[in-house]
């Protein structure tokens, strides 16, 4: 009965359909578990919930666990050894933030190592994540930086869509006729990275999804644009004021995301 109660209070399969309260570290981990489908952490999360009665310490440990997982996601670290790794945390009775930090610091195997700042920073403009991973990263950054006094309420994870600001089919309507073949390939790679992705509150109409920046931003008489569906998104809305969206802006936004 005790374990069943801990499970009910800790593991929340509907977390992606529920409001994420500021500072609710358990719900943030549940977003990673169910929104980004990293279920291998469940046994360890339950172990900590059972063995660590100090809520403050529990939250600090879970916050560091989130940092660890997010860094590995951003850098596209493998998950193949996660089962063994999280079992080893249980076996070594790791139930405090300091113990978790120290244990991770001693792991040098690339399959479980904590990525350093330089690798994380470079990955924001170098790595193409899956849509569910990119959405999860942006959502958790968005939820972390929002003020409780924000004029718009954070939606549930499932209520957001992910949008490539510069579309994959940029050749149709975006400036690029003067790009060399190599520059065009580099653009193709860059537009898949986090700096070119944003959360929006509703998927864009297919009629403007591949439109140029001005039309995609402002919308048309028949279809709303990013100014409607990305307004209020802390990680993006300021860029709606930009006259251009190009490689330089994508890299600038990536640096801003890293800073969060």
Language-model features: where?
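Noncatalytic linker/hinge segments flanking ATPase motor cores
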Residues: 85-91, 203-207, 243-248
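Generic hydrophobic alpha-helical scaffold/packing signal
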Residues: 46, 62, 66, 163-166, ...
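A cross-family structural signal marking well-folded subdomains
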Residues: 1-137
